[in-house]
Amino acid sequence: MPKDSISKTAQVNLQMLTSLGVPEAVRFSHALQLQGDPMALLRHLPLARQLPQCISCISEVLYQSANELILQADNPAILDLACGYSPRVLLMAPRGYTYIGADLPDVTADLSARRADILPSNAEWFAGYRTVDVTDQKQMERVLGALREPITVVTQGLLPYLSLSEKRIMASSIRELLLRDGGCWVLPDVDAKTLVSDTFGAVLGGVGAGIVGRVNAVQDKLVKRDRSQMTWDTADKIVEELTDLGFAVRRVPLYRPGMELRCLDALSKDAAARLLASWESKSSIVASV
């Protein structure tokens, strides 16, 4: 993927969380001062002004669902694969967790260069950003081999970009890590196939579902993704595959009562109710060995 595309896709979730006023996202954005608007590529689409609202809903529910599961697991270390410009480091690390962010070179080089702007100088809880291609088993072994404590691995927004063989390579590496050191693997977005269309439909009504295909087409072109090759796109498929690979899998609703979601404040009561009902029918997964 070209450097510019990597930067744009990595910025989207941060921009959405910042627009909602999520505190650590606001601080992270202020520190980074990223340039450009990653949503500009969608400006030509119908309902373009409403699209950020839909995307921010998806960004927040996945981010908060993952965070809640990470805190429940309470493992001392967190490995955030395909971390992008996630503000999760500013939420988790001050609580005493060792945070490691991993992504492709353009993202990790940018974040590492800005470390002094992002983090306090005495941030002992921050283990750093690591460059890793999750589809390269040797790279995964190099990054994961340095860890020696129970860990929560989180993959938010990563699975839809990987082929079946690439997912299996990543899963095998994570399984070996968990067998050695203990911990779990948090997958917040296992119902990716329907999450986007159902969220757009709940927020925008009948016209929402119709725009999803055009949004997907823009994104697929940007990241050079072939949706015909996508697998593990439903929770049932992922549970089956991970079970076959030797994981013990626990499913939980994507949205759980008590989760605080700022995105709901801008919706009508009816739209919020539709959205929550949709999310409660979808899953996140915690896998262990």
Region annotations inferred by a language model:
Residues 1-79, 83-130, 147:
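Rossmann-like AdoMet
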Residues 131-137:
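Conserved SAM/SAH-binding loop
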Residues 136, 159-161, 191-195:
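Short, catalytically relevant binding-site loops at active-site mouths
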Residues 139-140, 161-174:
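A short, conserved alpha-helix within the catalytic core of class I
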Residues 150-166:
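A short SAM/SAH-binding and catalytic strip from SAM-dependent methyltransferases
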Residues 178-193:
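Conserved beta-strand signature within the Rossmann-like core of class I S-adenosyl-L-methionine
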